[in-house]
Amino acid sequence: MKSLQALFGGTFDPVHYGHLKPVETLANLIGLTRVTIIPNNVPPHRPQPEANSVQRKHMLELAIADKPLFTLDERELKRNAPSYTAQTLKEWRQEQWPDVPLAFIIGQDSLLTFPTWYEYETILDNAHLIVCRRPGYPLEMAQPQYQQWLEDHLTHNPEDLHLQPAGKIYLAETPWFNISATIIRERLQNGESCEDLLPEPVLTYINQQGLYR
C-alpha cells in the first residue's frame, strides 16, 4: 500500500502556530509521515499578502527547519498568475502514480466556501479533502446541492484516505488555536508581543525585515 501524501496550501503571511500545530496533531491522528506546504504567490480568493514571496518562503523555511514532518514546494510561488488549487492538484496527480493516495488539507472555513473555488468539482478527482474543524463554523453547507455533495463524499474512517487515491472528505478533530495572521499583523503594528503565536526564528526574521509595521 502506497503511503498517503498530504498537501497544505495557504498564503502564510506570516506562518504561525495556528497553521503548524493542528497539522502536526492531524498527522498523528491519521498516520501522515510527510506534509508538503505549498505557499501561494497570488491568492485568488483573498487580499494580496503584505510580505513578498521570498520573505514568506524564508519564514516557512525557518518555521519547519526542526520539523521533519514538513517539506516545502515552491511551484505556486513561481507562478505570476493566480494560484489555483485545482491546477496544482492536477500537476501533482500527473507526477504521481495514479493509485497514490493524495490529500489536500483545508480549514472548516474554507470548506464552506469551497464551491466558489476554481474548478472545485475536479479537486476530488485528484485528491481527498481533509478538513480541520474550527469552532464557530456551521457543519452544513449553505445550499442543499452542496450539502449533498459533501455527504456523498464524506467518510468517518481515516483509513479510507489511505486505501483510495482520491475522492473522500474527512472532518478531522484537530485542536483549534485562536491565532490568525491578521491578529499577528495587528499586534506587530501596535508593538505588542507575538512570542506565543509563532516560532521564535520567524519572529526574529520579521523584526529584522521590519515586516508588518
Swiss-Prot record:
GO molecular function ontology, one term from the record: ATP binding
Pathway(s): Cofactor biosynthesis; NAD(+) biosynthesis; deamido-NAD(+) from nicotinate D-ribonucleotide: step 1/1
GO BP annotation list: NAD biosynthetic process
UniProtKB keywords: ATP-binding, NAD, Nucleotide-binding, Nucleotidyltransferase, Pyridine nucleotide biosynthesis, Transferase
InterPro entries the record matches: Cyt_trans-like, NadD/NMNAT, Rossmann-like_a/b/a_fold
CDD domains documented for this protein: NMNAT
Catalysis performed (reactions): nicotinate beta-D-ribonucleotide + ATP + H(+) = deamido-NAD(+) + diphosphate
Class of this enzyme: transferase
Gene3D superfamilies to which the protein is assigned, alphabetical: HUPs (3.40.50.620)
Enzyme Commission code(s) on record: 2.7.7.18
One Pfam assignment: CTP_transf_like
Keyword Transferase annotated: yes
Family: Belongs to the NadD family.
Cross-referenced PANTHER family: NICOTINATE-NUCLEOTIDE ADENYLYLTRANSFERASE-RELATED, PHOSPHOPANTETHEINE ADENYLYLTRANSFERASE
Function according to Swiss-Prot or TrEMBL: Catalyzes the reversible adenylation of nicotinate mononucleotide (NaMN) to nicotinic acid adenine dinucleotide (NaAD).
Name used for this protein in its record: Probable nicotinate-nucleotide adenylyltransferase
Gene name as annotated: nadD
